[in-house]
Amino acid sequence: MQTTPHNHACGSADHGISRRQMLGTLGGGVGFGSLLHPAIAKEIKKQEKRVCLIWLDGGMSQYESWHPLPDSKFAGPFRSIKTSIPGTHFSELMPHTAKIAHKISVIRTMETMDPNHSTGVPRIQRGDPIDRGVDYPYLGSAIAKLLGPADPGLPPYLWIKPGNGGFIHREAGFLGTRYGALALGDGRPPVHIHRPDSISAELDAARNALRQKANERFKAYRGASEIDAYETSYDMARQLMARKDIFDDAQLGPKDKERYGSHPLGRHILRARQLLEAGVRFVKVNSYHW
């Protein structure tokens, strides 16, 4: 019996690079580093693409999700079910995702060859399969460098994580501190995002101009790296102060809140959607509860 080959590209003019082309460009690379091939970066920038990376630390088993092996010794207690792609099966725990399998890409061959979680997690997010003596940037930092902000009035890379927030400059690796991630603890906006009533906009601008002059003088006699990180965190905070409306939960309807759920991961992903729709280029969402 003949079957029609599945078309992995969605066919939309908005998606000029098909999944087949992207995977071909990735070639033998491991992790996300090869996504930064100039051809892909140029196409993504032209289309004004934005990215949400949802990282589940530890994660669910592939045998109970994307790659069930019912006849192997590793099989769990759950059945495999058919998807919208002939010949492709998911776990029975994912019935809704199985219905839209033709709209997503599932990569079953990615690995780091690193058995340690503590080193494997950053390795796959950086895309450096072997140690080269260089601190490689994480995906969000690399995209911030290559594509820049989707909206010049917003930071290009935000990170929503449990716990505390702050500016995480080490994510940028060799790109330099200015491409680090601004972390939002529990998805909350930075502390003191509202300017005190006692400080006018004119006074605030004058204070920041004085700060910038002091930083320039300080950099002339000391290393610039730490000062650059300090300046970048300040600039990002000022951008968010000017756009604090993007954190307004009143704009979210009850239907959205119900769809995403009241648990931390659901709330954080909904916040990521808010930020992406507002114009942030890249948002990473972390869950540490797996």
Predicted regions, residues:
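Ligand-binding pockets and gating/stacking loops
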Residues: M1-W290
